[in-house]
Each structure stands twice: as structure tokens, then as C-alpha cells.
Amino acid sequence: MKGNLAYSATLVFLLSGFNAFAFDSFIVIGDSMSDGGNRGNDSRYLAGSHSKLYNEILSEYYLNKPFIPSNFGGDNYAEGGATADKLSPASIRTSEQQIDFYLSRNNGRADKNGLYVVWIGANDISYNIVNSVKKLDFHGLLHKGEDYLISPSPDLAVASVKKLLDAGAGYVIAPNIPKAGLSPWTSVSLFSFAEDALGDKFNAQKFYKQMNDELKNKGEISSEKQRREYIVDAFKAVLDKNGLPIPRSVVNVYQQLVTDVENRITGQFNHSMEKGLSKLHGNIIWADVETLFDEIILSGKEYGFDDVLVPVCQIGVRSFHCKEGAETYHDDKVYLFSDWFHPSPEGHALIAQYIASIVDAPYFATSLSKSLENLNATHQSFLDGQLQNLRNNPGNNKLNVFGGFSGSAKSAQGNRMDLSGRETANDLNVGLSVQESPALAYGGMISASDGDYKVNDQYRYDSRGMVASLFIQSSADNGLWGNMSARFGSLSLDNIKRDIQLGKATRTENGKTNATGFGVSLNAGYNYKLTDNITTGPVIGYQYDKYKVDGFRENSGSSTAMHFSSQKQERHVVSGGWNISTHSLPVNPYFEIKYHHHLQDDAMSVSGALNGTETSFTRTGKKPEKNRTSVKLGATAALTDDLNVFGTINYNHEGNNNNAINYTFGANYSF
């Protein structure tokens, strides 16, 4: 019961953002880690009757639909026992044959906007070790370098990824393999070897159960040394119980040797595979499940796991035979493993969270340019208020000093993939203008900005920076007016925080970077005189902006830390609307409504990857709304002959409940 509650809570959190629909399809190639039942329940290695594999959770998250095995018409081609090399029985497709089967159903082409998983290699390692021992070929087993020398299996796994990319696959997730020495099987490896050698003459199940019972009574693990000591203690207790008084030192040496060999070989396989993948071209999403499991096993409680030594199903019982109500099924605690190799339902849910965090991260990072957009918008909004003030209060040979505050606030309702959460920015503005004549004014302005952005429940950052502009404005007696401004800004984006939910743990990755922007605005209008104090007329505008956000690296050494490329964007926006203004009154209100249209609406693109890999992939962010409407209400007032004040409130609507408000308040003093 306890495990079911933890599993349900994890699913609720992950699937709360399932409206993403970021991909058109989801296809999985692999072995029993991913097999959803291509041969019925006997190939579904997962404890419990209603549990979900990591890929079934991801399918609901990204496509909002169940994930069905390929033999039943779906896109899960993974088969239990599968390998990259031709090592399994002929009835089990290799990863390459699974891809061939998939392509044969899809006219030989992969989906350019599809998300693929190729998770293969664990069975290759098992076959390779057994075959090497049978042949007395220990060269690859004893090799202590970084590369895998036992067989070409890592290269064949890479070839499977390449085959999908060559067929047009958009994104390929390539998880590595958790250390075999950390699985429950390692604790009973000696008994497993005896069972293989002696068959029915050796009652392995008795030893498995005794080992399972001994390990279940151990406490929390805080180090690898402690984990090994628990296993050695349990191993020694079982041997003593069965009249085999082998010295503890011998047991320790054996256990350490087996664990080290398994872990080293797994690490070599992962290294060779990653090295091969780094030479490919395409969107490869490397998922470091090896390091993730290292972190979980040494801090199980933090992630919500009560036991990382024994599985849900008693050691020696395969998980597809282990369902609720069976004597060998345990739901008293939350376990990391279903059986002696495969993850538990909670383990699969955590893997899904982990993979989703990697896939989504560059997409979230595309939102960083919003700070530049807001800085430009609040700066320009204040400048427009000053230019309106100058039009309302013309003069000759006046030197004007002006300043004040401006800011913006936005709160949008949607899922985390909309990238439109809460945004606030506040600016301090100061400027200088020269009024050469009633018809001509020019000057400059500088703004210091402070912003706070919560893009969604997983991504947030702060911004601090400055923007400076030069402007010129001309007004004619017949009511025509026009102005132009050019601006340059720079920002420090600090406290970039990306939250990753992993079971019960919330991990936060931190980073920081810089951003720069350049822009030009052109505005013109005509004021038709309705009365001595009221004018009205059309307004038109054009705005060009160019943004750049530098690349950055998250600063932890964890399995989730990533690095991201720089991002650039150009925007061209035309606008048209209508203005009603008052003049020569103690307080001169004005109203303006505008329609804005993006001529170029390309979205930001960002490449990213885990810090420990040379592979990378690129995600494109959300396209800006093609059209938006703004409504401005403002006023200017002459307090004295030399002192004027002005203020505006500007409401922007972009659809999808995405609304923003800009405000300005300033004063102008003439000398």
C-alpha cells in the first residue's frame, strides 16, 4: 500500500503538465527495461498489476495517450531479452531488427517531429560476460581502461541510433545502463552461479529467500562502503545458517571483486556508447541513468525509497510472476527494484521524471529572452510617455531633464509548456532632451531594470541590467508628427533555477548568463483637431529588435546538470491604431489603441545536453503570438511653467489568457 501511494503521487506531479503535445509521436526500441508486454504479461518486467513503465508515463506526458506494444498495433517495439548484437534467441528482435520492423510500417521513414528512445545493452553485457568465461577469454573482462573491449555491442547500439537519425528521426533519447553491481542480483551472485552449475541439485530459492530476509532488516544506506558491508554481513549470516563457515574476509573479497567487475564493465559500455554517439549528427538526448541510480542508492530516503537492497518481489522471483496478493509480493515499503534487475513502479516513475527534465530543459531556456523583451517594452513605454509630454508642451530652446519609474506585470494561465507564467519588472529611468523648436526635439535616456520571472513551476530567474537610447521627434503645425529611437541594452540573468522532481526529492540546478539587445522604433501619427483642446487621428509604428542570450552551464556535478547554447532572435513588428488626445488643459488625458502584427515570428532555439556528454539536441521554444492588441491610457499635466508630470497604463493582450500591464510615471523639468 505504501508503495502504491508513493507511485500515484509521482504520477500526479509528472502528468500535471501533460498538455505539452511537444512531439507528434513516441517510439521506443529496447529490451525488458522498456517492454510493455509484446509477448503478453510474461515479457512485462514490472511488479504489480496496474503499474506503468517509464515510457508509458512519458507517452501520457508528451502525447496524452496510452503506450501500446508494437505486436498489438502500438509504438513500443522493445522486447524482453533483446540485444544490440545478435546474441539472443532468433525469436527476439535485436534493436536493429526492431527499427526495421518500425520502418517497414512507416514507408521507411521516421518522424521528424517524433521522440524516440533507444535503450539497449544490458543483455549484451550479460551475454558477453558469460561467453567470455566459457571461452576462458578474460582480456576484455580484466581490461581497466575506459573503453569496452569485450564485443562490438556499444558500436551496434550506436548504429541503431544512427539508423533512426538517418531515417529522419527528430529526437532520440539514449539512456545509459545503471551499474550492474548495484542491482539486487549481485548480492546473491554466488548462489546464482551455483544454480547455473548444479541445476536442481542446488536449492537456490532457499538461499535467495534467506538473503532477501537478511537484507530487508538492514538500515538506511549512506555510503557505498556501508552498502557493501550490509551485503557482506547478510551473505555471511546466510552461509553460517547453512553450515558454511566461510571467513568474512573471504566473503568481502568475493563480493567486492564481483561488484567492481560488474560496475567497471557497465561503465566501459556506457563510455564507449557515449563516445560513439558524440560522433553522430542529430538530436541525441543522452540520459545518464547510471549516475542517477548511483545518487538514488546512496540517498534512497531522500527520493522516497525505503529499500534499495531488495526488490518488491522476493529475490529470485521474476517480476512478471509477482503481482498483488502473491506471497512473494511486498508492498510494506517503497522499493527501488521490482526484481533483481528491473526498476520498481516508483523507480520507473522517477526515470520518467528524469528523462522529461532533460528533454524539457532547453525548451524552458528559450524563455530567457523575455527579460530583454520586457526591458525594451518598459523602456520604450516610458520614452513614449515623455515624447507625448513634449508634443503636448512644446517650447523653444528648452533643455529638459526627465525621469521616473516604469514597469510591467504579467500573469498567464496555462500549462508549463506555454512558457507564460508570472513576470514582473521595474525600471528607474532618467533622460535629457533638447527642444530646438516647437517642431524638433532630441535627446537620450537610460534605464536601470530589475526583473523577476517565474516561467512555470519548474523554471525561474532574475534579471538586472540597463538600456540606453537616443531619440528624435518632429512635429508639424498641420498635426503630423513622427519620432525615432534606437536602443541598446544588456542584462545579467542571475539565479536561473530549474527544479527537477525526482520521486520525493526536488532538486534545483542553478546557472547564470548575460544577454544583450538592440532595437529601433519608428512611430508616426496625425492629430486631427476636433476642438481647441481635443485631437484625434491614426498612429502607425514599426519596431525592430535583435536579442542574444549567451550560453551557460549549470554549476552542479549531478546527473541532472546541463549546459545550453547561446540563442539569438530578430523580431519585426508593425502596428497601427488610433489616438485621442487633449491639449492645453490643466490635466491632458489621452487614449490609444493599437493592433500589433509580427512580420517575423521565428521562435528561439536552444541546444542543450547533460554536462557529462558531447552529444546535444536542439529544442525550439514557443512561437510568439502573431498578433496582439494594446490599449493605453495616459495623461500629462503642467504643474508649473517648467515642471510637467506624465503617466500611462498600457494593457497588452496576446490571447490564451496571456495579458500584461505596463505602467509609467515620470516628471519633466525644463531649463
Language-model features: locations:
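Bacterial N-terminal signal peptides that target proteins for export
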Residues: 1-7
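Outer membrane beta-barrel transmembrane domains
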Residues: 354, 445, 467-474, 564-671
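Outer membrane beta-barrel translocator domains of Type V secretion systems
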Residues: 366-530, 535-536, 650-664, 668
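Short beta-strand segments
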Residues: 28, 78, 117-121, 176, ...
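Extracellular/periplasm-exposed beta-strand and loop segments of Gram-negative cell-envelope proteins
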Residues: 126-133, 142-150, 186-191, 257-261, ...
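N-terminal signal peptide c-region/cleavage motif recognized by signal peptidases
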Residues: 17-19
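Conserved active-site regions of diverse hydrolases
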Residues: 22-394, 407-413
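Short beta-strand segments enriched in hydrophobic/aromatic residues
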Residues: 33, 62, 355, 407, ...
